[in-house]
């Protein structure tokens, strides 16, 4: 499993040594660790690591005059020095042989201990910040610079300091440059302040809110004005906070203007806008060739050339190797350098069969050695969605090309529904009916969730077994009322997939991709495979699993255009994941927001007014130099220089209701 990314809010805690031992014994496993400030010297740090169930070791981390960090006290003889505590911890996680106890035994740092914020105040304090949509986690300064350079002046984000545990950084664009303001957290009180400003705030939100109403002014000849106007939203969230994030982004952004515009719709709109330019550079030539036109159910939905499934063992005639199907791979490679998958898996996303493509479909299944087929559609929903490509009767074989196919078992599956889910389902039905939306498939259905078929394929002397799972209650328009049945369905899909992986033949003939299709092969198909992939990440990693629905959908669309076709399907992904995480959390679920999402919305923005006057009084704060040099310190042993001279900024303290609070526009 890929190493967990270290993130400031899940490995640093504002605790003493005694509390650190308590946390590691209660919640940790051998090799788990946390970082804290040293009690004897506030300039230094300590890494507390659990060695055994009843043994906790504390490793002293010394900060030299050069600002470099090391576990060795003598700066002149130490072999490894680090520019940040994050680099230090990552180094010893990657190279455990470099760290030994006094008795000579290796001391292994495996992963940061997970402390549930539901139960521990020190964890709640650190985790609360992550709920902000403008929080960008462990983003380095160089990446913040890259993100903000293309944004307008006044755009800002909040991130974790790479060098100071517990500290945050405001990265903001002003006059075409990016500046970084460090927000320090007092280790004794937990309050926040910007360097140079004596005002301390109880939370990062209150600090940002204050500075968004009062601009920051550079002290000196340049006199640049820094406005915190427009937050740059991030879509990343960790699994244990996903439920609260869903509650925040499902609400209207501005109810007075529109009840339809939510954080989710905003994400989906941005996703659609970003997809259009990218697709101009990806070829779909093969699917658009006249010879292949009749093989496409919808003429405008064809695969990319670089990810299409190419049928082999075909005659050398134009179009003979074509099928409207695309690979979608959740695998770690150079292609996925910005995405890490803890659970690697592959799919084939394809359209519902036409009568003329059934033979091609089964040739593909055989060629790829796919053993599981997922069909989230009926054959007909007002019109044909998919031609029946499996035998109509049990134990009566059909022949498609050189493949003989027999359905040996057909079983209807119905899952029991809890009273809680029934109540939620009835409420959702009532809400939709009130809006004139009648979910016929679920409202009037017979309660059958899906059909499981066992199919036997024969080609020559070879025989293979296939499982097909056909989901029956996905409504023709929209999405299921409740994710409960879909989640159970996907559990059974994974069970069948694991069954085939466990067979002895899998060692010599590995199981191929799961085949998923609806009608067009993009809407329900995309929703199912993205949901399955994200659920498997959570099951593998746990509550610290990074969740990013936006980036996952963006990623799969590089394999097949339009996967997750509608905003409703995109919202259903959030809804299903939130339901799963809420009902599979081993700790008591505690909401940060308690229905008050405004507390986690971005602060009111200060709009610059032309020709406004400079305030008479201001507070001084400091910012780092607006360049990426400070963020490039990645070597583990190369010497580093001390901090550079930093420009001074002022903060206006006048009332925001008066134009005099706004500073004069600076000369270019």
From Swiss-Prot:
Main subcellular localisation = cytoplasm
**Which compartments does it reside in?**
Cytoplasm
- Region described as Disordered: 603-668
Catalytic residues, per the record, are 518
* Magnesium among keywords: no
Please tell me in which tissues this protein is expressed.
Expressed in embryonic cells, developing vulva, body wall muscles, head neurons and gonadal sheath cells.
What happens when you mutate residue 36 to E?
Answer: Fails to rescue fluid accumulation in clr-1 e1745ts mutant
The entry's keywords: Cytoplasm, Differentiation, Hydrolase, Oogenesis, Protein phosphatase, Repeat, SH2 domain
Reaction catalyzed: O-phospho-L-tyrosyl-[protein] + H2O = L-tyrosyl-[protein] + phosphate
Q: What class of enzyme is it?
A: hydrolase
Q: Which GO terms describe its biological process?
A: cell differentiation; MAPK cascade; mitotic cell cycle; muscle organ development; nematode larval development; oogenesis; positive regulation of epidermal growth factor receptor signaling pathway; positive regulation of Ras protein signal transduction
Q: Name one GO cellular component term.
A: cytoplasmic vesicle
Ranges for domain SH2 come to: 10-113, 134-232
EC no.? Answer: 3.1.3.48
Changes seen on gene knockout: RNAi-mediated knockdown causes an increase in ectopic formation of membrane extensions from body wall muscles and a reduction in life span caused by early stage mortality. Prevents constitutive dauer formation in a daf-2 e1370 mutant background.
User: Which residue ranges have biased composition labelled Low complexity?
Assistant: 616-634, 652-668
Cysteine-cysteine disulfides:
none
Domain Tyrosine-protein phosphatase positions? 264-580
Query: GO MF terms on file?
Result: non-membrane spanning protein tyrosine phosphatase activity; phosphotyrosine residue binding
PANTHER family membership: TYROSINE-PROTEIN PHOSPHATASE CORKSCREW
Protein family according to the UniProt entry: Belongs to the protein-tyrosine phosphatase family. Non-receptor class 2 subfamily.
- Protein name from the UniProt record: Tyrosine-protein phosphatase non-receptor type ptp-2
The taxonomy runs: Eukaryota, Metazoa, Ecdysozoa, Nematoda, Chromadorea
